[in-house]
């Protein structure tokens, strides 16, 4: 009787957790769509002079995408720590902890950008286009890429040594680029019932799959390195002006 009650309580908790996760994903996807649509619509509708004169407008444009970025990375980091998952093997441990460091770095860059980027005057039209059109889209896209890569380090994800899944890999990357609103949960790699998987308990990856993962990682790192460079350049210029005065 007690065992049955405990099992039912556990199933109820699991169902409640899954429901909360579903609500979170829906809310996050809505915020992502709003951030991209709002920034692009603002860029197309308003005069470019208003961006330079109104810091609140600049803040409103980058607030949603960078907030979504920071929240998602912190959520992924929290999920990794809460899972109590211990990676096996030196290479797997290095990869796992490296991704956790990346999550922290990307979250810090996102928060810093919310504070620093609106202060900059966005003096030319190229800056306005970068911050209001290109930045929101690529920030959201990079979040999905990093979320997918991060999933590959977890215990529940397995990769298989088959070449036909290369098509799925390419379709996943193209779909994320074209439709960044979709959650990375739908693109997780799962183990498939193949002869190779039945012969071995551990999954192996092909060289081409590893190359794709490296490309995804480089794209995400490049995006946030660019944002960090813009922030540091602006802070350095501000410091130089103070010394001149």
Swiss-Prot record:
InterPro entries: UPF0328. Pfam families: DUF2463. It comes from the Eukaryota. Belongs to the UPF0328 family. This is UPF0328 protein ECU09_2010.
